[in-house]
Amino acid sequence: MPSSPLRVAVVCSSNQNRSMEAHNILSKRGFSVRSFGTGTHVKLPGPAPDKPNVYDFKTTYDQMYNDLLRKDKELYTQNGILHMLDRNKRIKPRPERFQNCKDLFDLILTCEERVYDQVVEDLNSREQETCQPVHVINVDIQDNHEEATLGAFLICELCQCIQHTEDMENEIDELLQEFEEKSGRTFLHTVCFY
């Protein structure tokens, strides 16, 4: 088992649903975890598919909550967005963009292939300083409340298994293969260096 706790990051596009659900569950399980988005803006569903609510990453969850409450309390209560923002603001003040974070992690979990590609591209574009490895793993999770919850438990189980390996570098591929068979999902995995 690694001597120090795993430093985990969970990344989706807007740092709202999938990454925050996993952040919530991992932090309750005692993990050192942060969550991020990779998008240029934060997007939340709006009154129509072509009318999303778009916010800057500097906007707090509380400000988003109050804005949507003012726009259409019934709609955003019914579709679960207000509930999600209420949870989010209890975890941290605002969404964070992965590309602006210079902290080091042992494990970065992404929630869709496009986000995985953006994270890997960002890490590879940085100047290598410590040569410390970071494992980037993609778990495809549909962006809805139910799938976010199921995905978060899967991510948590995966983190717990990795935390208990004797030698993460040599055991992770085998572990991921077991998880693929058990969950019926395919995981992308690569190693980048800081």
UniProtKB/Swiss-Prot annotation:
UniProt catalytic activity: O-phospho-L-seryl-[protein] + H2O = L-seryl-[protein] + phosphate; O-phospho-L-threonyl-[protein] + H2O = L-threonyl-[protein] + phosphate
Alphabetized Pfam families for the sequence: Ssu72
Coiled coil: 160-186
Main location: nucleus
An example Gene Ontology CC term for this record: cytoplasm
Key words of the record: Coiled coil, Cytoplasm, Hydrolase, mRNA processing, Nucleus, Protein phosphatase
Localization of this protein: Nucleus; Cytoplasm
Gene Ontology molecular functions: RNA polymerase II CTD heptapeptide repeat phosphatase activity
Subunit structure, as described in the record: Interacts with GTF2B (via C-terminus); this interaction is inhibited by SYMPK. Interacts with RB1. Interacts with CD226. Interacts with SYMPK.
Family: Belongs to the SSU72 phosphatase family.
Protein name: RNA polymerase II subunit A C-terminal domain phosphatase SSU72
Native source species: Bos taurus
